Amino acid sequence: MATPSFGNSSPQLTFTHVANFMNDAAADVSAVDAKQLAQIRQFLKANKTNLIESLNTIRQNVTSSGDHNKLRSTIANLLQINVDNDPFFAQSEDLSHAVEFFMSERSSRLHIVYSLLVNPDIDLETYSFIDNDRFNVVGKLISIISSVIQNYDIITASSLAHDYNNDQDMFTIVSLVQLKKFSDLKFILQILQILNLMILNTKVPVDIVNQWFLQYQNQFVEFCRNINSTDKSIDTSSLQLYKFQNFQDLSYLSETLISRISSLFTITTILILGLNTSIAQFDIQSPLYMDTETFDTVNSALENDVATNIVNEDPIFHPMIHYSWSFILYYRRALQSSESFDDSDITKFALFAESHDVLQKLNTLSEILSFDPVYTTVITVFLEFSLNFIPITASTSRVFAKIISKAPEQFIENFLTNDTFEKKLSIIKAKLPLLNESLIPLINLALIDTEFANFELKDICSFAVTKSSLNDLDYDLIADTITNSSSSSDIIVPDLIELKSDLLVAPPLENENSNCLLSIPKSTKGKILTIKQQQQQQQQQNGQQPPTTSNLIIFLYKFNGWSLVGRILQNLLHSYMEKGTQLDDLQHELMISIIKLVTNVVDPKTSIEKSSEILSYLSNSLDTSASTINGASIIQVIFEIFEISLQRKDYTSIVQCCEFMTMLTPNYLHLVSSYLNKSDLLDKYGKTGLSNMILGSVELSTGDYTFTIQLLKLTKVFIRESLSLKNIHISKRSKIDIINKLILHAIHIFESYYNWKYNNFLQKFEIAFHLTLIFYDVLHDVFTINPHQKDQLIISSSANKLLQLFLTPMDSIDLAPNTLTNILISPLNTTTKILGDKILGNLYSKVMNNSFKLCTLLIAIRGSNRDLKPSNLEKLLFINSSKLVDVYTLPSYVHFKVQIIELLSYLVEAPWNDDYPFLLSFLGEAKSMAFLKEVLSDLSSPVQDWNLLRSLYIFFTTLLESKQDGLSILFLTGQFASNKKINDESSIDKKSSILTVLQKNSLLLDSTPEEVSCKLLETITYVLNTWTNSKIFIKDPKFVNSLLAKLKDSKKLFQKKENLTRDETVSLIKKYKLISRIVEIFALCIYNSTDSNSEILNFLNQEDLFELVHHFFQIDGFNKTFHDELNLKFKEKWPSLELQSFQKIPLSRINENENFGYDIPLLDIVLKADRSWNEPSKSQTNFKEEITDASLNLQYVNYEISTAKAWGALITTFVKRSTVPLNDGFVDLVEHFLKLNIDFGSDKQMFTQIYLERIELSFYILYSFKLSGKLLKEEKIIELMNKIFTIFKSGEIDFIKNIGKSLKNNFYRPLLRSVLVLLELVSSGDRFIELISDQLLEFFELVFSKGVYLILSEILCQINKCSTRGLSTDHTTQIVNLEDNTQDLLLLLSLFKKITNVNPSKNFNVILASSLNEVGTLKVILNLYSSAHLIRINDEPILGQITLTFISELCSIEPIAAKLINSGLYSVLLESPLSVAIQQGDIKPEFSPRLHNIWSNGLLSIVLLLLSQFGIKVLPETCLFVSYFGKQIKSTIYNWGDNKLAVSSSLIKETNQLVLLQKMLNLLNYQELFIQPKNSDDQQEAVELVIGLDSEHDKKRLSAALSKFLTHPKYLNSRIIPTTLEEQQQLEDESSRLEFVKGISRDIKALQDSLFKDV
């Protein structure tokens, strides 16, 4: 977090920001950005003296006299803030925020010191500064603790609030006082943590020892005693003023903080006394023991504590201190014979500690401080040292086990290999299987480490038996001889016995009616020990009479301890079945300990081979005949105990058995699954499960939820293991049923847990942590993989149930969405505010992270599924968005900023159909502006959080894409849309506008990670695309030039593209992404800019552009062979799986990068037990590595394609925008694009877009050449056309297969258009045709002949299908793809025209005709015209016109026309239904425009064309045509005499055609065809064929009719009608109507003149 500095435009670096940075850097300093680390180190160097000095809270004259704000002054006095020296506090509008920031800064200083002590590498210089002044710092810290304690209770909220009448001010005071109190407690806790690190394993000076003990006695202990009262820490005097607080949570938090402070006081004291963890003893060479005065001071303090201690009152010092002092005194006396202390002086401290239950308090101390392993280590070392002084008994061993098992591995090993421990352990083992003396202590110690347990229990060499009398023992005394390993002589061991016969003994805890006895065979040696004296002494001290003599016989007998333990547990089961919770405490504890031991055995950390072996031992001695357990394994015994404990509500046993089952699940899922199917733990047959009963009747009443937490752990593990392939043999139905029940139980918990009563407040977080993690994992595994495979997952039904739970309709009231929302805004609660800096561990942070992840995933799933409507969860998030922004601005929770921004991004990205919610409305203007200011501060921070920056850029981009116009305008301009004209560039407030920061940050790309730079540039792209005032980027030469420089350097990307390492691939991916964004920006710059001389345009028009660009379009990163082989190998290895099933799908554009490739974590779960996956040998395929590489390869190719598409958009924009002809380099680009399509094709779906991109780019460039008039050499044109011809024949186009149904038309249409353009660019047709005739003819046959044939055949086929269904010609026939077919036909017709326009040779035309005839194209055209009446669009026979247009164009080539005539052209033109309709006559353009068009522009044009080509050869057919259409001809000519005639250009054209037809017929002497042979005397009669035009009289009559229009212009004006849309527009516009009428008049005059002219 960076806080704005008043009077300074740039934010200042804060301790809070540095502390958070160091927290992230602590994991791996080497991975931190070097520049940022240097800035942090510079800050620390400048402020190192202030880290400690500025923490002292005792200051004089803290408030300024000039501050007239009463509330601000009160708070400043409360916090000891000098307002004059703190401008942020003085000028902050939000006092609560300022106070939180002040406390955060104070806490962060300590956090920085702590981080440096833990990880000095962060800043060695500052660490050395602190280390060199270590003990001065320690002294100052102790003084600060004293100061805080001294001032803790001076001010109460009620006394301060009393002076205020304003409720809001009272509320602020009360809240801040409470926050300060807890902040002070945390402050002390932090200091103690630092103190312990600084004095650990050091020789503490005596002045520090004296200072500590003085303050400890006078202040620290009294403070802890007093503050332990809730009203002291919570200030109950003001409870009425803030009823909103959760008093229970605050009470627990208070107790937790105080108990930790008190415990840390103890640890600090132990360390000051010299406990050294490196040597596992107290260092008596410390100054404390060298200085007599100081030593006596400490001794006197402890003696005084012993002497003045009153019954029922806690001592000043923890019993551990007294215990330690007794050890120290004994140790000193042993080393220094002159020591003056006698036994009584030493033992009184030990006795005092033991009287205060020191061991149990040690256990409590360990539990309280378990959040940090350092303290567990200290206590473990203390226990190791104490082995010299205390025995290992049933009770002490229990404490040892609980504490030491939590210590770091090295210290566990040190303890277990300690010489003293080994000696005591050998004595314990010798007494086995005696219960109290040996068995219980050994089992407890075995809980420390499983390896240790197995080593000690697997082979036991002694068996102890107690007997009051030896009379029944048949033995002989012997002296045994053993060999001395250190010498050649033997050693005689006296007083041994040897059994003369077998001895039968009962195993421990065997039932009275059991007949099971253990036989110790004869000849077994042993030793008899008397225990009379020991017992006498003990019992005489208790005032009892001495007992009879008792004997302990230890036999040298080998047996397996595990078997004995298993037998004992079975015996305990029998007792438990009888007595239940009335079972003896000792036996109950033993039962729990054994179950814990078996739990450790089955823990996944233990190898399955080892655990199976031990489980076998444990089951060896079970009584199968008497057991009620099927199979009588130790696991079944524990299951039976679990079932009984559930029935009897024995909570301790329930928890331990559930933990056992959790640990058992990973390796023995089949056993757990079998048990859960039979058990009543979960709901069954409509009956509520015992888990719910325990929750309701036990946990909710006690406030302890350990079992529920353990059951959630079991749920998580069971789901994970059920997905594993190793458990595929277990019934899928069974696993699904169990998982569904576990999830339903988890749902039930989630809906209500938030409001439960808790004894341990952290359990609330733990429950939330497990629930959110379970829900997230289930939903993620199902909805982020291949959607066709998700239903196969056994968790699919549970995932759907979770969706129903969370994504409920908006009008519903459901608990789950409310609970999840409450978690997200929980940092605003007083309790969780106090947890701000993770002082109580990072569990809360984990809960929040899980909850944000779950929430964003749910919204992403909803947004990606069109069937899911906006949910109640989203509605709640919008309603609570203001609170989310409040959390965003909290100083203590800066680590949640990324998650909040990501959530808001998903929220605004999700689609809404109706009632779109506007974020600005929910935030309000004040909160929106505060949000903007915080965001601006984050964007301008001196040391950036790159993840936050990346998330902010994504949020801006998403905001601009969404409909959140109000917030978008605020962020872009710094002002609200209602305030000013947002389209006015002057309305932008540069100080508050995101644009300003984006512009500044865009110049820092070199120092920004590529991933963040890409998101920044993506945001700028959207700004350019959506915001009219975004020209600041275009006008900024620095911005443009910096991007251009990166673009020019992109050539280096391709210096190595083969055999890339993983790191090189990742690096190249990042660079591709960056180049892609730059290119996108340039495309928008060109589009939006009016500057024709811009740097970008000049750059793109450079001669060597080809060298820079051509590589980007070559997508060669995809390793097809590798992917194919990987899929095959995966299938061979795991036949039941498909690798494609694990391919992830992006649910949102936001997480597109994360969800690309294969789901490795899910594969880890599924294949976790397979060594071929986890630990392949060198000879095996490393599938995990190869799949990781495959995912990376897919990502790499994806960005190759994205970059190529970006370049395509830029070149397209440039080509359209360029005002000058393109240079020759673009021709090379076209050739390159076509070659790439030939070489690489698009065999994968992912390559289709780039394949099309190259085709379309080729067309745009060629079209630009055409528009600019640029000439291309014929050789280059031919070269390009040959490449296009090759592409047409490729499998990607598959023209013959697709053209009929117009499939993949986006592939072939740009190619056809490119050919059209190239044909237009041909300058010399004859030479061109000569050079390319063969290829062109082949192309023509493929594309035109076959293309037209296939399209028309498909149309005819559909017509025939419709006809068979009985549709009459009056019905509209629906033809699939007719519009696309029509477009393709017209495009092909254009191609034919272009080919004929280059004047091909006669021979070329003959071959064309032959091709059309042989393919059947001509025939199908004629057939379609015959059926054209059946296809009507808007009741118009559209296909009739198209087919006649084709015939007309084809007839322009004489050889083709001849083929058409031979194919029956005239008969088709005469007899087709459309022609017959026209033959009825009176077809006028105003009433039947389509039919008239077919007649005039189709039939008449074709007949005239044929007549002009073939003359007398087609005269009979032409005369027949005229006779057939005589009525139409007559009506057209005679209608000119009609006063109501509507004059149109179409009518004039038709009349012109008829006049021309009559003249041509006359010229060919058509009358001769009608001369009939008659007598010589008979006169021949003239035949009238073209009625109305054949005679001079008719012509004069028509001329007269035309003259009427010419001589009466107003009349003509009134009779003119339009026949096209263009004509209609001309007539409607007065300015153009007159000219149009004049044109018609001229046309009529020309028609009149033509009547009497020769052809």
UniProtKB/Swiss-Prot annotation:
- Keyword line: Coiled coil, Isopeptide bond, Membrane, mRNA transport, Nuclear pore complex, Nucleus, Phosphoprotein, Protein transport, Translocation, Transport, Ubl conjugation
Question: Pfam family of this protein, just one?
Answer: Nup188_N-subdom_III
- Entry's InterPro entries? Nucleoporin_Nup188_N (IPR018864), Nup188 (IPR044840), Nup188_C (IPR041634), Nup188_N-subdom_III (IPR048883)
Q: How does it assemble?
A: Component of the nuclear pore complex (NPC). NPC constitutes the exclusive means of nucleocytoplasmic transport. NPCs allow the passive diffusion of ions and small molecules and the active, nuclear transport receptor-mediated bidirectional transport of macromolecules such as proteins, RNAs, ribonucleoparticles (RNPs), and ribosomal subunits across the nuclear envelope. Due to its 8-fold rotational symmetry, all subunits are present with 8 copies or multiples thereof. Interacts with POM152 and NIC96.
Name positions with the PTM Phosphoserine.
Answer: 340
From the record, give the transmembrane residue ranges: none
Q: Does the keyword Ubl conjugation apply?
A: yes
Q: Where is this region: Leucine-zipper?
A: 250-271
What organism does the UniProt record list as the source?
A: Saccharomyces cerevisiae (strain ATCC 204508 / S288c)
Q: Name one GO biological process term.
A: RNA export from nucleus
Q: What is the role of this chain? A: Functions as a component of the nuclear pore complex (NPC). NPC components, collectively referred to as nucleoporins (NUPs), can play the role of both NPC structural components and of docking or interaction partners for transiently associated nuclear transport factors. NUP188 probably plays an important role in NPC assembly and organization.
Could you list the residue ranges forming a coiled coil in this record?
A: 35-62
Covalent link location (Glycyl lysine isopeptide (Lys-Gly) (interchain with G-Cter in ubiquitin)): 406
Residues annotated as signal peptide: none
Per its record, how is this protein called by name?
A: Nucleoporin NUP188
Task: Spell out the GO cellular component terms annotated for this protein, sorted alphabetically and separated by semicolons.
Answer: nuclear envelope; nuclear membrane; nuclear pore; nuclear pore inner ring
The annotated topology with respect to the bilayer is:
Peripheral membrane protein
Q: What else is known?
A: Present with 11700 molecules/cell in log phase SD medium.
The main place the protein resides is nucleus
Q: What family is reported?
A: Belongs to the Nup188 family.
Please give the Gene Ontology molecular function terms for this protein. structural constituent of nuclear pore
Which cellular compartments is it found in? Nucleus, Nuclear pore complex; Nucleus membrane
